[in-house]
Amino acid sequence: MNDTTVVGYRHSKSWNPNHKVYFAAVFSNKIIRHRFDDTTKRLFLAFDNTLEAKTAVIEARVAISSTDENGAMKNLLSQECLRFDQAKEKNLQLWEAELSKLQIQGATDKQKEIFYTAYYHCMIAPNLYSDTDGR
């Protein structure tokens, strides 16, 4: 779309032969070159890493949509814009709050590990499968 944004989709041919997941990605540095490999279906990007560039670390904000590329972009724009370290800290706090809702007593450390791992797996993908605009 522009020199910091890429949109597209991934076409899965496994469990659902026509399943597409659309995405929008915005990068912190400018994309100066790109190449799409038709054989592997991969996009290769080269970023501006000059001294004038914002940062040596390139951050990406990514959103997905089951509807279309515009839906992915709307989803991206509707979310709070955090730096990576901010998002990591916020999500660590959210996970800690969620996982601490249940506590077990009288279990061995191994049993606790199994329990909390299973609980984590139950909570890892509570997805709302619609775009921010309700589609």
Regions found by a protein language model. Give the residues of each.
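Acidic/polar, glycine-enriched structural segments that form the non-catalytic walls/loops
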Residues: M1-R135
